[in-house]
Design a protein with these regions (language model features):
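Active-site SXXK
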Residues: 71-85
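Non-catalytic, conformational "gating/processing" segments within enzyme and secreted inhibitor domains
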Residues: 149, 202-234, 437
Length: 449
């Protein structure tokens, strides 16, 4: 399962962080944490409501860490990690979890790769033993590797190549980040997937899949005192990677002008347009810049009360949908997306011009105090009514730490959102919504509009 942006299931940091925030909440629950001698960071989120636990291992490696020419190798391990060790037969990992009443899965972003199990508390040690085993002892044959490579190539054909919107989005990202690895698709380019080999995969695994490059997050019916002996027993003996590589990614120079791309496909029935801007993220900002950007973009296009929706859908009636979103969770930066679909008979030229007018007006006067308050409230409410569960907190803390943030950053997020001023939101909107730092994409039927 590919994750972009988590925040990812979230991957938008703002939406994920806002979980459990309400009118009185000013911070998120603070977990217990400790670090083993081999470098494994452990985060424990106690929740005694049910005898259930969520066990997650987050590796600080994702698609952005792949060497040039081997795109898709990070995602490849979502498949390979289930192919067995000396102790566990191929496919037996998930079957064992299921036989014990649990479920498991994995996901990849540009910044991390994560594996999780949700299971009864009295089965925690079982999944911990299996997860620790495959951290360092994975085994797969040339035949297994080749078979999974074919599976992933077909996955790409179905999810990307057969989806006009996904193809356009992939092209837009490649233009927005021509050198930065965020411009490379998580699943990889097809010709590079087909060229992947077992030895390259093993070297990637031996380097990055190590306790000193991992975060163990356990949420549920357990506390640190109960958990630590189990962690020491199963993870404490694993050897760390010596000289773990620095995650130094190539940076893009400033854009010199707006970029455009269009994609035509016989499968497109309804034209649409979208635009992506480069942006800061929680890992790259200073002070409350990312918080302010999240609030600003929510005012601009985060809901049916937003500027874009009201102007284009309700007032001018030229769009069936319109909005904007901020992906501020990336370790290496973020992005803002603006998008709309016209009503029948309205051209994309007219729709784009109307979007530009709304944005220009927003950058001129900024959010009102009422809009600011509504945005903060909606960010809170959307999270409160979403997944009020231990998995949500495990995802929030795991993704945040893997992307370079701290526990304090997570705990204080609601308070920092509440503190965003109108002036801060406007300043970040003006810094970000710059055409020279954008790519505009049109999705069109094969025969045009």
């Amino acid at each position: 399962m590919l994750k972009g942006g988590i925040r990812a299931a979230f991957a938008a940091c703002a939406v994920a962080f806002a979980f459990v925030m309400n009118a009185d909440a000013r911070e998120l629950p603070r977990p217990e944490t400790f670090t083993l001698r081999n470098g494994l960071q452990v985060v424990v989120i106690t929740d005694r409501r049910a005898p259930v636990v969520t066990h997650m291992v987050w590796y600080r490696v994702g698609a952005a860490d792949e060497p040039r020419g081997v795109s898709g190798i990070a995602h490849f391990f979502e498949h390979l990690m289930f192919k067995g060790t000396r102790q566990i037969a191929p496919g037996e990992f998930s079957r064992t979890v299921a036989r014990n009443g649990g479920d498991d899965n994995a996901f990849t972003s540009w910044d991390y790769t994560a594996y999780y199990e949700r299971i009864a508390r009295d089965r925690l040690e079982l999944v911990m033993q299996m997860e620790a085993d495959r951290m360092r002892n994975l085994r797969f044959s040339d035949e297994t590797f080749a078979s999974e490579r074919d599976v992933i190539a077909e996955e790409r054909r179905q999810r990307i190549d057969n989806s006009p919107g996904a193809v356009l989005g992939e092209r837009m990202r490649a233009m927005l980040w021509p050198h930065h690895p965020y411009g490379t698709p998580i699943i990889g380019w097809l010709h590079e997937i087909n060229a992947l080999d077992r030895e390259t995969a093993l070297e990637f695994y031996r380097t990055w899949y190590a306790p000193n490059n991992a975060i163990l997050v356990v949420a549920g019916d357990v506390d640190a005192a109960e958990l630590r002996p189990l962690v020491e027993r199963h993870y404490g003996r694993l050897r760390p990677t010596r000289d773990l590589p620095e995650r130094n990614w190539v940076q893009d120079p400033p854009s010199v002008g707006p970029m455009r791309v269009s994609h035509r496909d016989v499968k497109v029935r309804q034209p649409s347009m979208s635009r992506m801007y480069r942006a800061i993220s929680y890992a790259t900002d200073e002070g409350r810049q990312a918080h302010a950007l999240d609030v600003a973009i929510d005012v601009l296009g985060g809901s049916e009360t937003s500027r874009l929706y009201r102007a284009l859908v309700e007032e001018q009636r030229i769009a069936v949908s319109a909005g904007a979103s901020a992906n501020t969770g990336g370790r290496g930066g973020g992005s803002v997306s603006v998008y709309a679909t016209p009503v029948e008979g309205v051209s994309l030229e007219r729709l784009e011009a109307a979007i530009d007018e709304v944005i220009a007006e927003f950058l001129g006067d900024g959010p009102t105090e009422a809009e600011l308050a509504r945005a903060k409230s909606s960010m809170s409410a959307a999270a409160i009514y979403s997944r009020d569960s231990q998995e949500s907190l495990a995802n929030i803390y795991g993704a945040s730490l893997a992307q370079g943030e701290s526990i304090d950053d997570v705990v204080n997020w609601p308070r920092d959102i509440e503190a965003v001023t109108r002036e801060e939101a406007l300043e970040m909107a003006r810094q970000t919504l710059v055409l020279d730092s954008s790519v505009t994409g049109w999705l069109l039927p094969e025969d045009g509009q």
